[in-house]
Amino acid sequence: MIDSDGFRANVGIIICNRYGQVMWARRFGQHSWQFPQGGVDDGETAEEAMYRELYEEVGLRPEHVTILTSTRSWLRYRLPKRLVRQDSKPVCIGQKQKWFLLQLKSQDSAINLSSSGHPEFDDWRWVSYWYPVRQVVSFKRDVYRKVMKEFAVTALSFQTQEIPRKRVRQRTTG
């Protein structure tokens, strides 16, 4: 769905774990990383689109997550001119996104990047909460900053465990 201003309706998904980290995924065959996201189909609510995209992109079902919150409004970003397809009608100049913050209830092993048969991502990892703001492609950075700021209190308050630290083995001489 592209609105009269040329923005495609889209949902963004931030999945957090019990350590306050967020899931960060690498786009298939590329070097760019981002949060899962995808378009809203005609007749679909933003929440329905989020659950569909959640399964298509990372293999998680509603029972694997809890919705903690969503953005109060739609956030927009413009695509760089080189990415705008002028030959498509209507022309899409960017995305307007409703974001959802989810808490993972299941084990990491429930994440399956190949669940749809057409993977969007080829790798993923847990990163610190603010890491994505500095790492996402530049044209999405302002939206990431806004959504992360809006979700920060909620996301970081659901940290239920400390991140396990690797034990350093001490050498003995003797």
Swiss-Prot record:
It is an enzyme of class 3 (hydrolase). Its cofactor is a divalent metal cation. Keywords: Hydrolase. SUPFAM superfamilies: Nudix. GO terms for molecular function: mRNA 5'-diphosphatase activity. Its EC number is 3.6.1.-. One of its GO terms (cellular component) is cytoplasm. The keyword Hydrolase applies. GO terms for biological process: mRNA catabolic process. Coiled coil: none annotated. A motif (Nudix box) lies at residues 38-59. Disulfide bonds: none annotated. Residues 6-149 form the Nudix hydrolase domain. Belongs to the Nudix hydrolase family. RppH subfamily. Accelerates the degradation of transcripts by removing pyrophosphate from the 5'-end of triphosphorylated RNA, leading to a more labile monophosphorylated state that can stimulate subsequent ribonuclease cleavage. This is RNA pyrophosphohydrolase. The lineage of its organism: Bacteria, Pseudomonadati, Pseudomonadota, Gammaproteobacteria, Alteromonadales. The gene is rppH.
